[in-house]
Amino acid sequence: MAEPVPPHDDFIDGVAVKDVVAGENSGSRFRIYLPERNDSSVDKLPVILHFHGGGFCISQADWYMYYAVYTRLARVANAIIVSVFLPLAPEHRLPAACDAAFAGLLWLRDVSRKQGHEPWLNEYADFNRVFLIGDSSGGNIVHQVAARAGEEDLSPMRLAGAIPIHPGFMRSQRSKSELEQEQTPFLTLDMVDKFMELALPIGSTKDHPISCPMGDAAPAVEELKLPPYLYCVAEEGSDKRH
């Protein structure tokens, strides 16, 4: 699952993949998935901006588990996927990953304004249909980026929706589901605690707004200008913490 998959310009199973750097000095890196198109098609494609999971400490946008999921999504949804290479803790503590993710959204906005250039996006992207998606800690980032986007002029681009997939929302106090959930070697509560200790700003607890956007320290959801959300949470999953 954690093996990196190299990009390929050829369409393999209907999808081509390339890695790009946005700007010479920004250091922002993205992986772009482009579905193969019918020669007669003139319709532009929606854009899905993806933030990977990994507890803010592990994982990369080019790992096989993401390649497998997002090549399929690009093909089935007929959408362009743009996945952000996120800076990882503890070398880069939060909000570094959120800042990089938001920079990715602003890069898409710049391309939509012709202030940036990316051939696949310039030719095929429908910037009126841009969505955010992220799994686990990437779901937390989806919420942070969506909240910031509400205070930003994104025109002519439009943020059409956000999809947090089993977001890693939690509190300092263990939830009922955390206490009842059977632990596995793949992910234990101690591992989650360690990830948060390494990722959150020094001195912060899991009640920090990034890990606990429903807590008292976070702005009220009613006060945020958010796009439509589709939450994906598995029953009996370890992320039913709120």
Protein language model regions, located:
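Alpha/beta-hydrolase superfamily serine-hydrolase fold, recognizing
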Residues: 5-242
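Cytosolic, low-complexity regulatory segments enriched in Ser/Pro/Gly with interspersed Lys/Arg
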Residues: 1-3
